[in-house]
Curated annotation (Swiss-Prot):
PROSITE patterns: SSRP. HAMAP family: SmpB. Required for rescue of stalled ribosomes mediated by trans-translation. Binds to transfer-messenger RNA (tmRNA), required for stable association of tmRNA with ribosomes. tmRNA and SmpB together mimic tRNA shape, replacing the anticodon stem-loop with SmpB. tmRNA is encoded by the ssrA gene; the 2 termini fold to resemble tRNA(Ala) and it encodes a 'tag peptide', a short internal open reading frame. During trans-translation Ala-aminoacylated tmRNA acts like a tRNA, entering the A-site of stalled ribosomes, displacing the stalled mRNA. Keywords: Cytoplasm, RNA-binding. InterPro entries: SmpB, SsrA-bd_prot, SsrA-bd_prot_CS. It comes from the Bacteria. It is found in: Cytoplasm. The keyword tRNA-binding does not apply. Pfam families: SmpB (PF01668). This is SsrA-binding protein. The keyword Cytoplasm applies. Its main location: cytoplasm. NCBIfam families: PRK05422.1, smpB.
Amino acid sequence: MGETTEGKVVAQNKKARHDYFIEETFEAGIVLTGTEIKSIRAGKMNLKDSFARIKNGEAFLYNAHISEYEQGNRYNHEPTRPRKLLLHKKQINTLIGQTQQKGYSIVPLKVYIKNGFAKVLIGLAKGKKNYDKRETLRRKDAKREVERAIKERMRG
């Protein structure tokens, strides 16, 4: 389903693609308070160790850290509160069916601003074993070596 992202990418979960095989991606909206969206627009968000879970037919994002807004007085938000994700019912049912299989989980890949709204790209992920991670690194290094050799050859 890979949607293209428009606008400013605010936060990326770089460890997600290292630790998981991403099977399918979904674009979801996030229910936020006023100070949260202001902090996100300022780029003060971290997706490290965050995950999504389906609870009572609704998707929630856990452990996503949005720093408190500097000018937000007593109405400021809690930095790591669970946040509701806005998905179509069909997408939620797909995620429920897939996550009930052993080894599948839902991880946020990136958060970006699209048409003034904060969106999160979540991925249906299957955990990698250590040997898979090493194999991925080997492949990446080999590709880098080939590109370096081609570049050197072109220079003459």
